[in-house]
Amino acid sequence: MTAVPVLDPVEAYALWAPSYPAHAHNPVMRAEERAMLAMMPDDLRGQAVLDAGCGSGRYLRHMLARGAAHATGVDLSPAMLQRAVRELDGGDRCTLRLGSLEALPVPDGQADLTVCGLVVGHLERLRPTLDELMRATRPGGLVLCSDVHPIGPALGWRRDFKAAGRRYAVRHAQHLYSHWHAACAALGLAIEEVREPLLDPADIPSGAYFDPVALAVPVALAFRLRRLH
């Protein structure tokens, strides 16, 4: 059996971008997105929002649809930002920037709401990443974060994809709930809500192979955090 190459995020998303739409396109993403949208304020009118690790722009679309006055998307992958340009129609309400979660190219306290969906696992160190998300969010503002649930890697699941007929995996670090709790407590981020969504069997394509265990365990870990100071 040929080993699946494990790529760093920039290399991986350069290959993945051409087939990566601006919506949840697999059962895990749909479960994660339902959890994140349930924790997101319904009315974002007048608010500045930030999508850190915006990819092709799926959460930017949701926030603009909920009335955000201005949305900024940041991503490390030039290919994914190019995809977002094609997918989004935010006009002057949306700005896209190349940058890393380790040094977001935005001013302190810019966002009323910061979203970071399924990205934190691409970085080895959780606390500095949360610190940077907090810096970009105003005091009293919200940070919504999600990641692949640590149960997944423990069961041998990988974040993988196909490009040009070949399968690849994306490098991923495992962050336990205890790591999140400790980092938030140290930084002054209040954990207001935690969700651990399960797969919806209706999202699994007919005839597709799925590990039966995947229907019995959480597939994502999602947090609603508030910057206290």
Which residues does each PLM region occupy?
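A short acidic, Gly/Pro-enriched loop at the edge of an enzyme's catalytic core
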Residues: 102-114
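Short alpha-helix
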Residues: 172-195
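Conserved Class I S-adenosyl-L-methionine
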Residues: 191-229
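A short glycine-rich, Lys/Arg-flanked "PGG" loop and its adjoining helix->strand segment in the class I
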Residues: 127-139
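Conserved class I S-adenosyl-L-methionine
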Residues: 1-44, 58-62, 80-83, 142-171, 198, ...
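A short SAM/SAH-binding and catalytic strip from SAM-dependent methyltransferases
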Residues: 113-126
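Class I SAM-dependent methyltransferase SAM/SAH-binding core
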Residues: 50-52, 56-103
